[in-house]
């Protein structure tokens, strides 16, 4: 897939120069792959002066790889754009992004017009995620992934965020600089297979929610208080029935109630544990990544 990607992006570089008066170069981030990815990047870097690459010592995840690419690029760039190597996002949208950056915008988001290339399940889960984030007062852009262009000062401001639990879609929006939007049609995947399965998507969603909102903790508190209130009412009801000489029967309802309460407690502990785990990771302040090789 990478040779195909290189060809498409080489054409884009020429168009950026002629249509947006912008010189560009490519930086590929190899996120600890075990196939021929780094070999292809190295050969491309030797053959083309506008191509370079970094190979991370181990897999840092999608957000970590994006961070590494921006941090490695910002010192020698007036603007930095990020795009996945499968080029399902329309790379030509970067021409309009560059124009807006040249006109004074600091962050230009690539926004999908539709989600026709997705399965119904992915459309449903994505839309549910965006709606959930919006209900929690998160400022992420609807139908925007991580396809964007940022000015140097925006990237430098982003680099000041110290957290290791990265959710760039949320962090970038909080920078507050001048924004622009470019709308594009996302392509169906032409080559290769997705390496972002459902398990990773769910983990990413949970990470995004817990990185930018304490709403799950507030919800647990609300559920706990509600159950306490219901329990008090039931206790009063039981006492009154006992005084009247009536015994409340129903082992089935008792067992169901116990299982229900046990499930809520376990879930609450799990959600609380996620937040505690995030604190644990942040407190250690480990390095974000290590570069094993450069090309």
Question: Which ranges hold each PLM region?
Answer:
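Hydrophobic helical membrane-anchoring modules
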Residues: 167-295
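Structured catalytic core of nucleotide-sugar glycosyltransferases
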Residues: 1-119
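Non-catalytic, surface-exposed connector residues within folded enzymatic/regulatory domains
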Residues: 3, 20, 118-119, 141-144, ...
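Residue-level signature of catalytic and energy-coupling elements of molecular machines
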Residues: 9, 69, 86, 108, ...
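Acceptor/aglycone-binding surface of glycosyltransferases and processive sugar-polymer synthases
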Residues: 52-58, 62-72, 91-166, 187-202, ...
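A ubiquitous structural signal for well-ordered alpha-helices
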Residues: 5-8, 12, 40, 69, ...
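Regular, well-ordered alpha-helical segments
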Residues: 11-14, 99, 134, 281, ...
